[in-house]
Amino acid sequence: MEYVFFDIECACVYKNVAKICVFGYCVCDEQFHILKKEDILINPNGKFHLTDRGGEGIVLPYDYDEFKKYPDFKAFYPKIKQLLEGEDKLVFGHAAINDVKYLCLETRRYKLPSFTFRFADTQILYMAMTETYDRQAGLEALTQIFEIDYTPHCAADDAYATMRIAQEMCGRDKCTLPELLKKYSIRFGKIENYQFNNSSSNRRNEYLREKSREKRERGEKRARFNDFVYGYRVRPQSQELRGKRFSFSRSIEEEFALAKRLVKEIVKRGGKYSLKLSGCNAFVEREGDDSVRRNAAYKMRDEGKITDIYTLGEFERLYATQENDE
């Protein structure tokens, strides 16, 4: 069994176009002994568009004029196909779905038969191992964690770094790579007939389903609160808060009974509630809140757009009557 790690660099990438200029790979045996490592330079038949006008973006460690000397993707298609396909090999990439998409787009561009192979993703494997499903671990970040030297965006080096990351993960769990995939319930991705699906892990899928459910529930809670604010119209009993337009932390808005009671107290005292942070001049935060909305409120205070920020406890002591939040 051979392990094939690969990485692709493109001259440009758009929604339905990816002009491959480098196919890098590193082939090793089951003990991670390197059998071959190579950069295949490819004429992309197009210009390089990797940076914006300000020079921001990717700079490949190659002389771009050199690519014109090489054949285009069609010439290297048989070799790449032979590298990736076959029952005697396991194929890996880091954020591999992007590279698989590039292969699919290029076969369509040159009217070549689709690739057919399965692949696993070291990024997804690492997230499953560390249970860090809320953020994607980039290749460069993992090379720092595992202390691996490599040249970023040199495709063969990226493939080598991906191999070394897989080797380090196997070393930490003291098992083979197939055993590691099984241990963390990694499902292979696949490309066939110009269609492809990503590698995945059962644990990450469960996490994403739970996050989706939580997001949906938060949205429903906020919608209920929004409807209340839009429809609540009563005559103020005093002008104590006249001119004050309040907004709350999202976590307060999502606790409907509490938020409803606080809004009633604001309106009763002549104030108003703004569903948009940009429309308020006073903000109520829950203790310990470090959300984007809360941080934006503090920035607005520094800019003079918000005059008062209260913790929930402070606000309730000053203005809110204590009732059962039902």
Features from the language model and the residues they span:
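Conserved non-catalytic scaffold segment of RNase H-like nuclease domains
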Residues: 2-104, 116, 144, 295
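Short, glycine/charged-enriched secondary-structure capping and boundary segments
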Residues: 18-21, 105-109, 262, 298-300
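Active-site-proximal helix-loop-helix substrate-binding element of RNase H-like nuclease domains
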Residues: 42-60, 64-67, 122-160
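Acidic, Mg2+-coordinating catalytic module of metal-dependent nucleases/exonucleases
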Residues: 87-97, 101-106, 133, 137-205
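Short, solvent-exposed loop/turn segments at secondary-structure junctions
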Residues: 96-99, 125, 253
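Short polybasic/polar patches that bind polyanions
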Residues: 105-108, 127, 144, 267
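A mobile, often basic/glycine-rich helix-loop segment
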Residues: 108-114, 118
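DNA strand-break repair and replication-stress modules
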Residues: 184-326
